[in-house]
């Protein structure tokens, strides 16, 4: 899709055409990428702003987000890197923060492409602790086995 300001009109057209859900993937400005990936859980990041704009215009359309740090990571990894190694548990903590920012913005479905051990339980517990019991977590097994994952 396009910039957040244009997305409501695109979402309206999609909904009129019978599209029930849209998936948002950010194209993060290089200046916002860091080794700590802080932009991933910024409540005013690109996908959160876009989601709020879409939901305000078309509340009935579903919005799906990807939960992964690679778009925000200066090193390009899905995990935080310390001492040349991916640190799983610290990464999972940050993925929970990202999932909460996305759910708070109005995401209905979270696809977890990050592949960190223990992330699903941690994300589910984090979502439920903050009242997001109805936010779905998509298995990437379903996504990989479909035509939906075509661009990659």
Predicted segments with their positions:
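Alpha/beta enzyme core
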Residues: 1-152
């Amino acid at each position: 899709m396009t910039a957040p300001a244009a997305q409501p009109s695109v979402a309206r057209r999609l909904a009129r055409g019978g599209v029930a859900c849209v998936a948002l993937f950010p194209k993060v400005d290089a200046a916002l990428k860091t080794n700590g990936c802080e932009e991933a859980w910024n409540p005013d990041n690109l996908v959160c702003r876009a989601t709020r704009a879409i939901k305000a215009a078309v509340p009935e359309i579903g919005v799906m987000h990807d939960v992964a740090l690679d778009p925000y990571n200066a090193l390009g990894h899905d995990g935080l890197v310390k001492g040349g190694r991916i640190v799983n548990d610290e990464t999972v903590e940050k993925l929970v923060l990202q999932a909460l920012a996305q759910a708070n913005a109005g995401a209905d479905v979270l696809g977890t492409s990050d592949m960190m051990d223990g992330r699903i339980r941690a994300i589910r517990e984090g979502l439920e602790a903050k009242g997001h019991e109805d936010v779905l977590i998509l298995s990437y097994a379903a996504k990989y086995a479909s035509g939906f994952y075509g661009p990659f």
